[in-house]
Amino acid sequence: MASAVRGSRPWPRLGLQLQFAALLLGTLSPQVHTLRPENLLLVSTLDGSLHALSKQTGDLKWTLRDDPVIEGPMYVTEMAFLSDPADGSLYILGTQKQQGLMKLPFTIPELVHASPCRSSDGVFYTGRKQDAWFVVDPESGETQMTLTTEGPSTPRLYIGRTQYTVTMHDPRAPALRWNTTYRRYSAPPMDGSPGKYMSHLASCGMGLLLTVDPGSGTVLWTQDLGVPVMGVYTWHQDGLRQLPHLTLARDTLHFLALRWGHIRLPASGPRDTATLFSTLDTQLLMTLYVGKDETGFYVSKALVHTGVALVPRGLTLAPADGPTTDEVTLQVSGEREGSPSTAVRYPSGSVALPSQWLLIGHHELPPVLHTTMLRVHPTLGSGTAETRPPENTQAPAFFLELLSLSREKLWDSELHPEEKTPDSYLGLGPQDLLAASLTAVLLGGWILFVMRQQQPQVVEKQQETPLAPADFAHISQDAQSLHSGASRRSQKRLQSPSKQAQPLDDPEAEQLTVVGKISFNPKDVLGRGAGGTFVFRGQFEGRAVAVKRLLRECFGLVRREVQLLQESDRHPNVLRYFCTERGPQFHYIALELCRASLQEYVENPDLDRGGLEPEVVLQQLMSGLAHLHSLHIVHRDLKPGNILITGPDSQGLGRVVLSDFGLCKKLPAGRCSFSLHSGIPGTEGWMAPELLQLLPPDSPTSAVDIFSAGCVFYYVLSGGSHPFGDSLYRQANILTGAPCLAHLEEEVHDKVVARDLVGAMLSPLPQPRPSAPQVLAHPFFWSRAKQLQFFQDVSDWLEKESEQEPLVRALEAGGCAVVRDNWHEHISMPLQTDLRKFRSYKGTSVRDLLRAVRNKKHHYRELPVEVRQALGQVPDGFVQYFTNRFPRLLLHTHRAMRSCASESLFLPYYPPDSEARRPCPGATGR
């Protein structure tokens, strides 16, 4: 039974609420109103709650708790639907002929009304409808009773709610295919002129509700309910009536609030949003937002401004591991052969694990799928398996037009899709809409996660379904310590499965589990991952290790990962592997024990960093990656959670090591790319754009690791920020190729050099990205001594060249920005005086600036004391004196001299695979 909870107005969320706080000044004044049903605005939210707000002030009066609007199964093994809690609309992920999200031409209530029905493939569908009435005290929100068929009672405030349940059965298999429950309040639309009611705006994915006076456009109040708003109701003539409301993207509300904040307003009086919106040069588009809450995924239509990234219509949302198809053979190792197909089926007993990053966010409105169903209700229309374009996605840019359309065009089209006539569809057939649509679901490429909050449990007999290969060995980043698997230099083979897991006889170690040479305490959990993977603190031959436990069904994956570990762990920056044991139910891998992940290194200021500075961390990261690439191994899942920090060695220093080889790919001899037949590998927000393209021009290469490493570089250098923004839209921003390197924009030497490297690594095209050796050779990693030596070598090389030589012209091109117009004006007076004693230097010449650096270095001991004090100690202080004043000098000089990369003098400054290998201009006779 629903229960009521009296509450006060929730604490406003920082961000949007602060943006809107100014809007409320001068508009809200405390007033006392008689709390009658007509004075209440009732708002339903995704979690099933019904909130009573004051129409005048927006104050929360009470909350009626109930079951969630949408509930799906937690044990689905093949498919699921995306449901819209606003009206019960259903969406699928495509069919054999169509790609991407597609809307079904019926809702859950309509499907229940049409049941029982059967699809053409023999699957039966049943539906059940259950009604209930709640009698609520409008003053306190307390439920008086639930009205049932047993008898009436004295009503006070009647609220009706209907529950629709749809189930799918396959007579050829005893398991239930799919089921869902949808609940909605009984509330017809409010009659009357739209202009007489207040207008309401809600934010998708959040609980913010904004109420506006439709006459003046004045913002009346805001309220944050903490959960996305699904419906707005008023009490009229002894019953609920539904009011129209518009849902906007969170970023759109941010955008509007920020634009409002830059407009000058009178010192007093309400803010007129009509005037405000008239100043905005933007357009609002209708999109489909895919979100996730505690019960699973859901969809909701939302307006966005043109600055919000959208997932394109028709984008194939492949699962992380890729489902098997009729044309694909699943091998023992987990590899797949053959060409992919959109006719998807999942292996028996597997869990359909979707790519969350490809779902969550704003999508272009998908087309409507039309198909056939046996014994369909006549009101559902008819048609063949064709699609029609989505509704017009444009919405007005000005606020008052938006308010009017919210009650006319948008209200009619969005809240009542079932009222559209069949003539509005293209290519309609004579009958039956449901069967082929749901059949297409059985054959379509559906990969939606049916996830629930994982409960921490450490039991020997696990209940989880086997891991999909793409999620193999992923350790949850929510764990306090991530000591996930890695590798070690070892020639050990997989141990015999005859060894049984058994407890020790020692009373002091009675909690330990022993499998062969590995022992661990099941209660000492270091981390856990998807599908039943756990990592424990343990022992291997007296050495402290991390013990990674996986299901025995993952034998092929374990073997492949161990083989890659054995091959690659002959490097200090690849985690060490010790051995593998097999018990009756699990595999156990003994791995090097680490003390932190890179995520903890960045985000935990109290963590002992073991003497590792950010530049050292990134250099060791790239050193390990270069080693993998030299072995033709592509990691394919670089992210902070998979980069670990070892404990201090005898000198008190830690190491950065790469871990989690579950998605690694060994490229065959003679090949430099890999296919995506087995799905899109990686993690949301850290994947290269070529992995997400529908029709990439070329197969992905090791450059995908460089892109991921570029994201990690910026994450470390910025102290935890991501170059593609908020996690909700991160992957969509990657697709659009729009990184934001705001933390590296400052015009100082270190950030100028870092910005150049990170920008190259994040190139939207793989070809311009540097290789791992090129990254390591970039000036970003040069010591001060190497920088100074480079300046000296360049100056010596150019000393006798004329100003017309190509190399000198290349150095002087764009030199005005390098020397800041005249470098004489930016050095200290004692140094200026000393330079004038011996020769003349042109203040506009980059070559003369390098000459001054070289000469003062050569004659450092002969310089006056005040000049030496200004320059600092050689090499660190000396070179920083010049790079601090001329932050572009090093990078500019390095680019200009690239044509001399093949010369022996410059080999230390350019990688062996540098793009310039032609003879250096002016190198004759050197």
UniProtKB/Swiss-Prot annotation:
Residues the record lists as binding ATP: 526-534, 548
Catalytic activity field: L-seryl-[protein] + ATP = O-phospho-L-seryl-[protein] + ADP + H(+); L-threonyl-[protein] + ATP = O-phospho-L-threonyl-[protein] + ADP + H(+)
GO biological process assignments: apoptotic chromosome condensation; intrinsic apoptotic signaling pathway in response to endoplasmic reticulum stress; IRE1-mediated unfolded protein response; mRNA processing; negative regulation of DNA-templated transcription; protein phosphorylation; response to endoplasmic reticulum stress; rRNA catabolic process
Ranges for domain Protein kinase: 520-781
Pfam families: Pkinase (PF00069), Ribonuc_2-5A (PF06479)
Cytoplasmic-facing ranges: 452-926
Biased segments, Polar residues type: 478-501
UniProt modification remark: Autophosphorylated.
Lumenal side: 35-430
Cofactor: Mg(2+)
Signal peptide as annotated in the record: 1-34
Transmembrane segments: 431-451
EC number: 2.7.11.1, 3.1.26.-
Gene3D superfamilies with a match to the protein in the record: KEN domain, Phosphorylase Kinase, domain 1, Transferase(Phosphotransferase) domain 1, YVTN repeat-like/Quinoprotein amine dehydrogenase
Residues the record marks as active site: 637 (proton acceptor)
Family (UniProt): Belongs to the protein kinase superfamily. Ser/Thr protein kinase family.
Protein name per its UniProtKB record: Serine/threonine-protein kinase/endoribonuclease IRE2
Species of origin: Homo sapiens
